[in-house]
Amino acid sequence: MNILERMRAGELIFDTDPEYPSLYAEFEKTMKLVAQLNSGYHTPEEIRDLLGRIWGQPLDESVRMFPPFYTNFGKFTRVGRGVFINFGCTFLDRGGITLEDGVFIGPGVLLVTENHPEQPAVRRNVYAKPCLLYTSPSPRDS
């Protein structure tokens, strides 16, 4: 498994991992798109296009978001139909964020799926766990 697959699996990723520098290249790509998204006015279509590029998926025309929006990675966010994300949200998605159909996110929400161990000796390392948001009733409740 590569570093991204191991991260999604919840493994502790060490900062000495030979693949660790490749994460920074991905962060740089994402930060460029986020800066573009957060600069100036964009139509809803332009916002969806930029978010689709950040998240690596085409978005349904029913998805709406009010910038600014912040993320460090983006490739592990999945968004359903009818999702609304309000101003000033931050998604740290290395553990995976799934917003199922009809989810509304309020202003200033932080969805953080990654963390560092509390023990000082290994605090520079990172692990991630997934975040799932859905409306009730969800198809998962059936």
Where are these regions (language model features)?
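Terminal amphipathic alpha-helical/low-complexity segments used for targeting or macromolecular assembly
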Residues: 1-62
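Residues at secondary-structure transition points
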Residues: 10, 21, 74, 94, ...
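Glycine-rich active-site/cofactor-binding loop and its immediate structural neighborhood
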Residues: 61-114
